[in-house]
Amino acid sequence: MVEQITDKLGRPIRDLRLSVTDRCNFRCDYCMPKEIFGDDFVFLPKDELLTFDEMVRIAQVYTQLGVKKIRITGGEPLLRRDLDKLIYQLNQLEGVEDIGLTTNGLLLKKHGQKLYDAGLRRINVSLDAIDDAVFQAINNRNIKASTILQQIDYAVAIGFQVKVNVVVQKGVNDDQIVPMVQYFKDKDVQIRFIEFMDVGNDNGWDFSKVVSKDEMLEMIEQNFDIEPVAPKYYGEVAKYYQHKDNKAQFGLITSVSQSFCSTCTRARLSSDGKFYGCLFSTVDGFNVKSFMRNGATDNELFEQFKALWNIRDDRYSDERTEQTVANRKRKKINMNYIGG
């Protein structure tokens, strides 16, 4: 039986984000800049990561509190060995209606069929440019956009529902918006443009680098005949639009200009097994991994997860201003640990 719970702001819990690794094969400046995450950077050892059995146990308990959707994140989740086994186990859980994966897409041809066979159907691919030179400058690994586009085509061909996520930075890749809308208009792929956020401690964020939803929409409207689309469900983070001629849709995610804290229903488990109630958390999360490994029962997990959600009052993006960002003294948790 599912117990319906809410946090201090009346928000239910519906989504669980599981970060399966802190490692990534890209070095994008806004997430894992190469100057910090260099060849000598020490990532988490294997025994500090949650095991698949631990993740499944956590997810099973969360379904009793109302979780219906699970998203696998990282780091780059396709670097975690035997990920298809985790997908298969999660798919067996009663109450789980949807499992998704967020990836940079580089390893989709290598692992995609196994993941599909395990029951995964939805993939979000992070692709911040369609121009090879622009994309290579962002990922700092000399990986071409055309390589990722081929991986996306492969994923679509074997049956995945694919969305493309684009983090837009002023003066970096805002010139990619129109060509990317054009490219994906006639593909069976939905593209979403995300306002640049101040996630983690190392991405050099400030307001001047943000391209707002209104600015993005103006660029698109100058080149395409579009119309808005009604939200599909409570807590949907993207504002969707469709082309009038072929009804192909794209989304704009207003993470800075019009925050969606009031409808956020996501719990997060970091790659080292800690609970976070917000992508912008500054307080080190409750250590679920240690709690479990010290002998916690399923009922104790249930009560702990319930208590953590009941006291949740995070609304960072609602409160963000240039001054609050400048004055922030406590470090945020980096995105490769907490998951995007």
Swiss-Prot record:
List required co-factors: [4Fe-4S] cluster
Has the keyword Transcription regulation been applied to this entry?
A: no
Positions of S-adenosyl-L-methionine binding: Y30, G75, S126, M197
Residues binding GTP, per UniProt: R17, R71, T102, K163, R266, A267, R268
Q: Give residues annotated as binding [4Fe-4S] cluster 1.
A: C24, C28, C31
Q: Which UniProt keywords apply?
A: 4Fe-4S, GTP-binding, Iron, Iron-sulfur, Lyase, Metal-binding, Molybdenum cofactor biosynthesis, Nucleotide-binding, S-adenosyl-L-methionine
- SUPFAM superfamilies from the UniProt entry: Radical SAM enzymes
What is the name attached to this protein's record? Answer: GTP 3',8-cyclase
Name of the encoding gene: moaA
